[in-house]
């Protein structure tokens, strides 16, 4: 009985530790210590304004938060668009397309494969049409071929692929998983 009791405790501890480790790894896929905010509309009247007023965010709002909230170390705006076809040769898909800034990759743990890179400040300054592909979007569009340096059509606009995200575990998302985004 003592042997079986000891074995049962060890098995339960091993299961619990393995579950904790796997859960931590999958939460890491979304990002660590992050807060995600969405625009919306008001639910209460205020100062003569009615219910249902749109509340939107601007880049100035992000700059104000980073200045006034000392525990916030980084902010990335994110603009998401759905239902825009993305094409490479005869392959077409409609992933979530996310407009971001360079710090986004660090915040959300979006790491490019070794032969590519992430968006940088020069891309923003020069308004370059560059894209990072989620690993499953890359596989759908290019198969096993290298995607970096190739041109994909986003709608009717050409974008140069500068990186492909390394595969990661991500069990939660707020619009789509990173593997299915551009």
What is the predicted function of each stretch?
Residues 1-3, 10, 34-36, 74-76, ...:
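Residues at or immediately flanking beta-strands
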Residues 6, 13, 55-59, 127:
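Short, solvent-exposed loop/helix junctions and linker helices
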Residues 1-21:
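Short, strongly hydrophobic transmembrane alpha-helices
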């Amino acid at each position: 009985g003592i042997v079986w009791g000891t074995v049962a405790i060890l098995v339960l501890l091993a299961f619990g530790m393995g579950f904790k480790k796997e859960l931590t790894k999958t939460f890491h896929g979304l990002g660590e210590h992050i807060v995600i905010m969405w625009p919306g509309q008001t639910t209460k009247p205020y100062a003569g304004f009615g219910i249902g007023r749109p509340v939107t965010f601007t880049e100035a709002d992000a700059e104000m938060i980073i200045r006034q909230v000392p525990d916030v170390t980084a902010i990335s705006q994110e603009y998401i668009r759905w239902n825009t076809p993305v094409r490479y040769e005869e392959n077409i898909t409609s992933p979530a397309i996310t407009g971001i800034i360079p710090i986004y990759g660090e915040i959300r743990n979006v790491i490019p494969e070794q032969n590519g890179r992430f968006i940088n400040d020069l891309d923003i300054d020069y308004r370059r049409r560059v894209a990072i592909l989620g690993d499953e979007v890359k596989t759908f569009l290019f198969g096993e071929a290298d995607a970096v340096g190739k041109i994909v059509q986003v709608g009717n606009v050409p974008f140069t692929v500068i990186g492909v995200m390394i595969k990661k575990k991500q069990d939660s998302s707020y619009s789509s998983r990173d593997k299915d985004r551009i």
